[in-house]
Amino acid sequence: MAPEPKLRPTGLPSQEQVKELLDGEFARAGYEIENVVIDGGARPPRITVVVDGDRPLDLDTVASLSRSASEQLDRVDESGPGVTADAATYVLEVTSPGVDRPLTTEKHYRRARGRKVELTLSDGSQLTGRIGALTADGESVSLVVREGARANFSVRELPLEGIVKAVVQVEFSPPSQRELELTGQPREEAGA
């Protein structure tokens, strides 16, 4: 199999090049690049960098990361081999994964602590609850589940391998203080 070309036919950098260029700077800011999407067919072409971190991605951070990414990519445009002048015009977007991204790794669960999620378990059952702490070994997560119509809660420990699907839910009202306490996270940290 032939090696992947360094540059896409559009003259834009490859996903790997963008990741290599930006990884260090984004990591210093506390964020990890989860995905890079290059759309050379769009007019103008689009480079989307999806980042996630332990802290929520706010607008100031997006602006700072975007400026940094733009500077890094502009340097490649000016000096990089094979990057064409046409490639210098592109839309750069730095974004978070979005609320609809399923939680699939231990770090996703850690970052979602305090958030409401809908889970599908390996036995086919479904649960809705609030993500609590991970066990020290990172193999299980606690889930704060509402019991009955009253505001009674229980904490269930679930092995991550027994969770088939987990998606963060959009909330329009803040959780109760008791529910947050059971996640082990103060209200301020949960973004309430």
UniProtKB/Swiss-Prot annotation:
SUPFAM superfamilies for this protein: YhbC-like, N-terminal domain (SSF75420)
Record-linked InterPro entries: Ribosome_maturation_RimP, RimP_C, RimP_N, RimP_N_sf
Domain of life of the native organism: Bacteria
Intracellular or extracellular location(s): Cytoplasm
Keywords, alphabetical: Cytoplasm, Ribosome biogenesis
Pfam families (UniProt xref): DUF150_C, RimP_N
One GO cellular component term: cytosol
Primary location class: cytoplasm
Keyword Secreted on entry: no
GO biological process: ribosomal small subunit assembly; translation
Keyword Nucleotide-binding carried by entry: no
Similarity comment: Belongs to the RimP family.
Described purpose of this protein according to its UniProt entry: Required for maturation of 30S ribosomal subunits.
Protein name: Ribosome maturation factor RimP
